[in-house]
A protein has these predicted regions:
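Bacterial Sec-dependent N-terminal signal peptides
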Residues: 1-25
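Alpha-helical scaffolding within the catalytic cores
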Residues: 48-49, 83-87
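Non-catalytic, surface beta->alpha helical segment in thiol-disulfide oxidoreductase systems
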Residues: 92-119
Length: 119
């Protein structure tokens, strides 16, 4: 009987010590914004303005990556395309630019007007 009680007490102590206290206060987090763009894209400069505005609003917390690929980014000089960027555009079936993923949390890329409201 004593052994069973000691065993249960030991298991309970292990379970209680395994709990991690988590705060309920709002925490700052970093944001990763992938912007798909092209040098012949009409609206892409406005997308860059929006992305830079978000980065200025949260200095040191927003990381921007521009991926030049697709029909708006021909392989003429200066060629900003990469094989990885082209593969990402094809895999995500992106046809309108600028498009972006915020922290890669959505299944589909969203337009520049939705970047600041995305989780």
């Amino acid at each position: 009987m004593k052994r069973a009680f000691a065993f249960i007490l030991m298991i309970t102590a292990l379970q209680l010590s395994a709990q991690q206290i988590v705060t309920t206060e709002v925490q700052n987090r970093n944001v990763f914004l992938e912007e798909y763009t092209g040098k012949h894209c009409t609206w892409c400069p406005e997308g860059q303005v929006v992305a830079n505005g978000i980065a200025r609003s949260f200095p040191g917390r927003v990381f921007l990556v521009n991926i030049h690929a697709g029909s708006f980014s021909p392989a003429s000089f200066p060629n900003l395309n990469t094989d990885d960027g082209t593969a990402m555009v094809e895999a995500n079936q992106l046809y309108s630019f600028p498009a972006g993923y915020v922290n890669r949390t959505s299944e589909y890329a969203v337009g520049r007007e939705q970047w600041s409201s995305n989780p």
